[in-house]
């Protein structure tokens, strides 16, 4: 029967059969109680009543009024029956709900009882005399935190109580309080890799090991035998030993190797190398056609003609030849910029093209350009330009004059290629391209592409629209958009890359010039860039470089460098730039100072010329770590300021013998000193004490001289050397002392595992360095 009310609806005879069917179904589905016989009897009588009520033969014999009365009676009976069934269902549902509530209350009561028993067993509650106050608190706590334990926890507690276990489970979490680990709880022993630089304090060492500074100080006291403070600098080798005592791994990192490690490519030998385009720079005298040659090559660029792009001035560009080979050109304003970049260590260029005008010949700046290129140790091609304006014999004259500048042409048995060209008429440009590619092939220029990118900065600028941008040339690897790179004392994320055609690029391969944006600072031309893994690493590198610059400024004062301190012991070479008033002075001084150089040291004249000192001379001296010698030449104040800024020394002379004596003195300073041993004392071993923590303590008697703490020790046994090393500790009684004199006893400890026997002789000595003279 449908739930909708049908009392207000008109009941027709046509719906009688449906009503009868619904009543039959409801009667058959209605529940009944009692015995089976009673059920059958009642069912039969009920069916008989309904059959009588809906007997159509009887209904037909009744009048219409009686039929309607009969139907209404049946309808009312059906509605009454439906209401009774609905009320019975609601009553049953209510009873079930009350039953669930009772069960839940019983469960909560049981849970409270269980919790009280567990807390009393695990001593998480106060003693019995305070139980009344805490009981109220517990009730409040349970009221707020009804579900403090999970179902699994309750099950475990119940099982523990049922089984009457002697040690019920203890839960770390207390009521309403998140479990916290005690700060006094010792964690797991974690082995760390600890970086040990050249200078490190105990405080910094403790932080890197994540150990208590008191424990580290105690370990130093036990191992070294001396008392330290947390801010004391310690020897890096001793620091490595202390790190290993704490079961960590020490990694020794020298500040001198840190920059080398930054540009180190792991697995370089196994990575595949591919040919890379040569990088070419045009140098020469003003108005000899360097820019015209560059423009001629640019106009002949196959890639530019095909793309129809507009060339962007980004300091460098790349052309594609007819043979689909690429050449990268650096567009510098002159050899001064070339040398300025080289002064920063940027040996970017592979090939230098010296441009000489056929109608002018070799000029002053041409000679400077030649000397700069030779100092950079790069391949040189001489391009004789403007042959369309030259007279017969001009080219041959230039070729024959090159040997006096140490450039031997191929026609004279040398290796310098000479190429007559015309930028205006575009004559022999293809041959100059072939010469460049031939030299590049002989040089076997290769680079790894599948690694992090590193390269050089060509130029940088600030644009109102783009912000700070820089032109880079990739030396190795592949530079991508999104890379984090470190350049100079700044780091940045590459936001965009544009080539010289103004086209956006997603990646740049080796020798490719590219303009990037998104820099945080303005880098200098010649700065080297490298891609790092994260901003954290980039920040650490920049902080290290800034600290290094700060230390150098403190050590060097007002940038007043001693040129000879910058010549390291490996090179043992003094480079000079010589400027004189006349050519006769140049020849006399050159021959005299050349004789001073011997096998131990070498004097190299980078550039010699008549005239005053120029900006180019200062830049060349900076790039080559050279000193400038000026004989009978005045030095302009601007040049002195520039030299002071660059850290270059200028020495002026009027007497040739003073110049030669100074050169002899400077070369003497460059000689390596002689190191010899000086014995300071002897001691005999009388007793050996085995101390577990500090190792063996050797009881000695000083028979001659003095034993100092900084002395080196030789252990002699029967006239033979048994051991040689450093003193680890020197004590008299329980005091640490610096030295022990003759006829006194002392206790010493040696570094390393030394086999010492009673009767051995300890020979103390020191190393003394003595200067040599030419």
Swiss-Prot record:
Binding, GTP: 284-291, 331-335, 385-388
Region feature G5, mapped onto this chain: 422-424
Sequence ranges assigned to domain tr-type G in this UniProt record: 275-446
Major location category of this protein: cytoplasm
Chain intervals for the UniProt region annotation (G4): 385-388
A GO MF term: GTPase activity
TM annotation in the entry: none
Compartments (UniProt record): Cytoplasm
Keyword Cytoplasm belongs to the record: yes
Spans annotated as G1: 284-291
HAMAP family the UniProt entry points to: IF_2_B (MF_00100_B)
The protein's role, per its UniProt record: One of the essential components for the initiation of protein synthesis. Protects formylmethionyl-tRNA from spontaneous hydrolysis and promotes its binding to the 30S ribosomal subunits. Also involved in the hydrolysis of GTP during the formation of the 70S ribosomal complex.
The protein, known as: Translation initiation factor IF-2
Protein's organism: Wolbachia pipientis wMel
Gene: infB
């Amino acid at each position: 029967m449908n739930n909708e009310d049908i009392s207000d609806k008109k009941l027709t005879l046509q719906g009688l059969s449906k009503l009868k069917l619904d009543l039959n179904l409801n009667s058959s589905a209605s529940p009944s109680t009692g015995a089976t016989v009673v059920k059958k009897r009642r069912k039969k009588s009920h069916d008989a009543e309904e059959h009588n009520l809906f007997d159509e033969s009887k209904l037909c014999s009744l009048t219409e009024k009686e039929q309607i009365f009969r139907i209404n009676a049946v309808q009312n009976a059906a509605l009454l029956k439906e209401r009774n069934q609905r009320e019975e269902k609601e009553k049953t549902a209510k009873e079930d709900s009350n039953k669930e509530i009772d069960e839940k209350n019983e469960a909560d009561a049981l849970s409270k009882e269980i919790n009280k028993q567990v807390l009393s067993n695990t001593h998480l509650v106060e003693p019995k005399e305070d139980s009344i106050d805490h009981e109220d608190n517990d009730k409040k706590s349970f009221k707020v935190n009804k579900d403090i334990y999970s179902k699994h926890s309750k099950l475990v507690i119940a099982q523990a109580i049922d089984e009457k276990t002697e040690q019920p489970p203890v839960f770390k979490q207390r009521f309403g309080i998140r479990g916290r680990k005690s700060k006094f709880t010792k964690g797991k022993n974690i082995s760390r890799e600890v970086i040990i630089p050249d200078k490190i304090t105990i405080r910094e060492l403790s932080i890197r090991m994540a150990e208590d500074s008191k424990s580290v100080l105690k370990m130093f006291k036990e191992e070294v035998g001396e008392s330290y403070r947390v801010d004391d600098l310690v020897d890096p080798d001793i620091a490595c030993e202390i790190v290993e005592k704490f079961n960590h791994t020490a990694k020794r990192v020298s500040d001198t190797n840190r920059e080398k490690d930054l540009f180190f490519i792991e697995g370089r030998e196994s990575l595949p190398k591919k040919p890379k385009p040569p990088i070419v720079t045009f140098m020469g005298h003003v108005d000899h056609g360097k820019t015209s040659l560059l423009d001629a090559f640019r106009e002949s660029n196959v890639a530019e003609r095909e793309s129809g792009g507009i060339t962007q001035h980004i300091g460098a560009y790349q052309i594609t030849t007819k043979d689909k080979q690429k050449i990268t050109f650096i567009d510098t304003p002159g050899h001064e910029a070339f040398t300025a970049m080289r002064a920063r260590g940027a040996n970017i260029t592979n090939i230098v093209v010296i441009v000489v005008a056929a109608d002018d010949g070799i000029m002053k700046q041409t000679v400077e350009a030649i000397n700069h290129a030779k100092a950079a140790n790069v391949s040189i091609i001489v391009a004789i330009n403007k042959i369309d304006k030259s007279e017969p014999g001009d080219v041959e004259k230039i070729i024959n004059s090159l040997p006096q500048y140490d450039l031997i042409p191929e026609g004279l048995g040398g290796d310098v290629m000479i190429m007559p060209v015309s930028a205006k008429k575009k004559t022999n440009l293809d041959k100059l391209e072939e010469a460049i590619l031939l030299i590049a092939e002989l040089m076997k220029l290769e680079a790894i592409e599948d690694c992090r990118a590193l390269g050089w900065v060509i130029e940088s600028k600030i644009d109102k629209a783009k912000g700070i941008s820089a032109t880079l040339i990739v030396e190795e690897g592949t530079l991508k958009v999104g890379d984090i790179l470190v350049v100079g004392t700044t780091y940045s994320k590459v936001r965009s890359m544009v080539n010289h055609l103004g086209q956006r690029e997603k990646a740049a391969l080796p020798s490719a010039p590219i303009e990037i944006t998104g820099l945080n600072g303005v880098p200098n031309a010649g700065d080297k860039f490298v891609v790092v893994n994260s901003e954290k690493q980039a920040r650490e590198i920049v902080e290290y470089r800034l600290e290094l610059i700060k230390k150098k400024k403190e050590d060097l004062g007002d940038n007043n460098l001693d040129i000879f301190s910058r010549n390291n012991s490996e090179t043992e070479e003094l480079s000079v730039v010589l400027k004189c008033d006349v050519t006769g002075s140049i020849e006399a001084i050159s021959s005299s100072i050349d004789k001073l150089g011997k096998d131990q040291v070498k004097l190299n004249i980078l550039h010699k010329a008549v005239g005053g000192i120029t900006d180019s001379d200062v830049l060349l001296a900076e790039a080559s770590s050279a000193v400038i010698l000026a004989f009978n030449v005045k030095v302009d104040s601007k040049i002195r300021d520039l030299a002071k800024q660059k850290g270059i020394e200028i020495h002026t002379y009027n007497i040739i013998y003073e110049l030669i004596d100074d050169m002899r003195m400077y070369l003497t300073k460059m000689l390596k000193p002689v190191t010899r041993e000086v014995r300071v004392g002897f001691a005999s071993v009388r007793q050996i004490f085995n101390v577990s923590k500090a190792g063996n303590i050797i009881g000695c008697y000083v028979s001659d001289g003095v034993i100092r703490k900084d002395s080196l020790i030789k252990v002699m046994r029967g006239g033979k050397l048994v051991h040689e090393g450093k003193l680890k500790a020197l004590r008299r009684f329980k005091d640490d002392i610096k030295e022990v004199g003759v006829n006194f006893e002392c206790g010493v400890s040696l570094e390393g595992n030394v086999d010492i026997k009673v009767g051995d002789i300890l020979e103390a000595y020191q190393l003394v360095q003595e200067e040599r003279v030419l």
